[in-house]
Amino acid sequence: MTTAHTHKGAYSLGASFCAAVAIILLLVLNPGTTPVYATDVFGDLRQPGDASFVAGHRGDRSGAPENTLPALQRAIESPLEFVETDIARSSDGVPVLFHDRTLKRTTNGVGPLAARTLAELKTLDAGSWYSSEFTGERIPTLEEFLAIFAPSEKKALLELKGYWTPEDLAIVTELIEKAGVADRVIFMSFNLGSLSSAAALAPGIPRVAILRTLPEDVIGFARSFGVIGVVTESRLLRDRPELVDDMHTAGLGVMVYTLNSVETWAEARALGVDGIITDRPSHLDQWLAETAPGT
């Protein structure tokens, strides 16, 4: 996830209309599909003052390079309920875990990730930028992540980077089904088209929209696009503090990203959000334990 304001056309009226139509057609053509609700994924929706669930942003990047197997393993082995990661794809269509559009920040490569084959990506060093301890760490594939995730009892927030057609996304849903974890993953995206593709291919896997701006009618938006909730910035909820309660009344979940300080954690808890995505998951988990009522 990023707070950069890119993909300005992602929420254009035309794209939104097409995605909404796709969701409606999905419901018409698949009447037997079992609905998925926020409570199925997040448990009881929170009240103001309740502890949110904690999701490690790109794994536990406080102790290992983001979106690498060591960072993800740290999150899986921690007390956290959720791990969050990003899914991109190589030029030959293999799903890999990577956040940025380009390789420079977190590898010794340059240029767009999408321009490289998996074999080329696997030659890159994705660890030494973080620490010499992780020199030689490779960009993992989704399949490699699912292999360490499947034996756990965790849940995964899988952010689809950019636009995925149904054809592009088919390998992702196949890998999830093969790993037997379809009941423990949630698709997220800024891109409504990708969420529409996910709904068409795997309607039983819940979906969450990531929003940089909040529409006036957030509940209507969620209903239109068949999502169980939204992920947004806490500053947007600060301006509309009643919104969290309204969404919970409507059966929708609310998560915030990416909060890394005690002040922002306290504000999110006071609002009653269901989940906090953070770069400091162990610290947040400890803070929640230390500040729980009665401690």
Question: Where are each of the predicted segments found?
Answer:
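Phosphate-group recognition and catalysis centered on beta-loop-alpha active-site segments
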Residues: T2-T295
